C-alpha cells in the first residue's frame, strides 16, 4: 500500500499533463495489479484453507468464506 501511495505522490509531482496521459494511466494500472494477491481476503468465498490469505481459514460450514484462524504474526 505504501508503494501505491508513493507512486501516486510521484505522479502528482509531475503535473496534470503527464498524470492524465495514457502511459501514466497504464503505469498506475500496473501498480494496482501488482498489489493484488492470489488469495481470498476476510469474508471472501472459498472451498479450502489454501484459498484464503495468511491467518485465515475456510469456514467448514455454509456459508463458506475465509475467517480469522486466531493466529498472529507475519
Curated annotation (Swiss-Prot):
Keywords: Disulfide bond, Ion channel impairing toxin, Knottin, Secreted, Signal, Toxin. It is found in: Secreted. It comes from the Eukaryota. Residues 8-36 form a propeptide. The presence of a 'disulfide through disulfide knot' structurally defines this protein as a knottin. Probable ion channel inhibitor. This is U19-theraphotoxin-Cg1a. It comes from Chilobrachys guangxiensis (Chinese earth tiger tarantula). The lineage of its organism: Eukaryota, Metazoa, Ecdysozoa, Arthropoda, Chelicerata.
Amino acid at each position: 500500500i505504501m508503494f501505491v501511495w508513493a507512486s501516486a505522490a510521484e505522479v502528482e509531482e509531475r503535473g496534470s499533463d503527464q498524470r492524465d496521459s495514457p502511459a501514466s494511466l497504464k503505469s498506475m494500472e500496473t501498480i494496482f495489479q501488482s498489489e493484488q494477491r492470489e488469495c481470498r481476503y476476510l469474508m471472501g468465498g472459498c472451498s479450502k484453507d489454501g484459498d484464503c490469505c495468511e491467518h485465515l481459514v475456510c469456514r467448514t460450514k455454509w456459508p463458506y468464506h475465509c475467517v480469522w484462524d486466531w493466529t498472529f504474526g507475519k
